[in-house]
């Protein structure tokens, strides 16, 4: 799908009027030809489909093409963890000082769906594990970090600040040359929180990037980058930044007493802080429990903007899904569901009967996602006329508990402790309900994907689940759960049991069929969120920034998608 002729005409007109402005105001040696909108640089440790472990990768994969469709010039910068076959060496090298060493990084690039995808090449990223990195982005196993993560992410931020100035990119029909200095950086989560610090200490004070701004997006407050206070020296920042990092908590890890907190510094030093749903804003600023001890910093900043994520409506579309046997839309969902359910039941070894309601859980097996709550609550409902299928990987203890669930209830339950994309698609096509018992959920993607397939969510009332699932209209809410990870709260177990029973009573009723239709009638794409992101970034007032236009995203297989040496 390409920009319409009307939109191309608008872009051409704006390019003609803006060229002189950019030519005169640019501080780089190469000319910049821009059409409209803003130059936006997303910096993150994950970007789908190249590398991801969760929702961060989906956002950095899906939001930039939607902004590019509006006429903005968009780049993403992420580490090159593996030898991605669709990216090419730009032969552009820069030197950065990391810790007590000078490191040379190289940039790889491809142009996909209107976005410049840039990857930072260095042994710190490419040579951390034996063989393919895959999902081992932060450590060799779940819950274990690489010891040099601070240096790795310093390297990423320093390289990201060089990329807009040194990369001469010319794949776009409407833009050419380096991005220049009048840009908006979007730093994501604690891994990129030092970017605004380096921008101020190394560039702005030397007259570079004088008009650049930084938006800092919190995808998950639970991961903050807390390290021993002595590690501040590794960052090569002036002592004046120490108050932004300084942090005291009551925990003994990584050390007792004063620490540095990367996320605190990112919040303090950025120009605006955002997060991924309006309700998550309320939770983060409500107190230390849900704000994970950064609530005061967020109220001071303040954190006011939460924008619900969109989803990939190309990969996750029941009308075109290559992984499901019977494709369908809102008109044919009932008939197709019955057939897809029987195929799913046969695939996982359950009794084949389309009249039995099927509940699925798809996600990481960890405390945040509440998989331990679900396993504890399963006896409350699993012996009824229902089947439950759980798909996910994570902590070994929870994977073992999942296997025991299948052993205990062989007629009703199946647990698949592995990463299986085709099966996930089959589960959406064949299930009636998706259960999401998260202790906290900043936005959540799984409920959006489920609703697009007409699967009704049964979810806890937290974060983005509150904003995206409407009680009695598109799903069932179970209330908020205890956020403590150490134990499973019996109250939460009872809530799961009673609300699953409540949902099952509606199965195959007119109310249930209406909920399925309501789920599928929603626009869950990135188009709406992209407009809100545009508004938030325009408010930063970067010189030359303009609103975009109404355009269509470039399709994944369109001829504009190129990787050139």
Swiss-Prot record:
The coiled-coil regions, if any, are none
Tell me the InterPro entries matching this sequence: Glyco_trans_1 (IPR001296), GS/SS (IPR011835), Starch_synth_cat_dom (IPR013534)
Reaction(s) this enzyme catalyzes, per UniProt: an NDP-alpha-D-glucose + [(1->4)-alpha-D-glucosyl](n) = [(1->4)-alpha-D-glucosyl](n+1) + a ribonucleoside 5'-diphosphate + H(+)
**What's the family?**
Belongs to the glycosyltransferase 1 family. Bacterial/plant glycogen synthase subfamily.
User: What superkingdom heads the lineage?
Assistant: Eukaryota
What this protein is called in its record is Granule-bound starch synthase 1b, chloroplastic/amyloplastic
Pathway assignment? Glycan biosynthesis; starch biosynthesis
Interval spanned by the transit peptide? 1-34
Which E.C. number(s) belong to this protein?
2.4.1.242
Q: Where primarily located?
A: plastid
